[in-house]
Amino acid sequence: MKPAHRPVPVSGIAPPFAAYSHGVEVAPGARLVFCSGQLGLGADDTVPADCEGQAEICFANVKAILEGAGMSLAHVVRINAYVTGREHMAPYMRVRDRLFAEHPPASTLMIVGGFTRAEFVVEIEVVAAAIETPLAEEEPRS
């Protein structure tokens, strides 16, 4: 499956300051997958103490879900991420930026009060889109 999205060209606003797009266009007729929020819980029920380790597990879980639908991280069009403190923003962003440098999706990062278990410091949910034929390169719509 081919990714069904492309960044929306934008002018007149500050450029993204990390690996994300201000806007992402999804092709008509694309198949969508909505992933529930993934926590840093390993298959062996362990939780790394650090945000970066938890983010790696979150994205590995997302990758497994997308593979079940015949997709990959390259198909992600939107990320909503939640961390429990400002100190977790940079470690989360390092993982996200490394994984999405080539195909930066639209992305939001929020600081929240906590999750279902105190040891969780990051939760990630995504939307992915795919079509059999990729979007043609064309001028943006007015």
Which residues make up each language-model segment?
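N-terminal presequence-like segments and the immediate start of the first folded domain
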Residues: 1-60, 64-77, 83-142
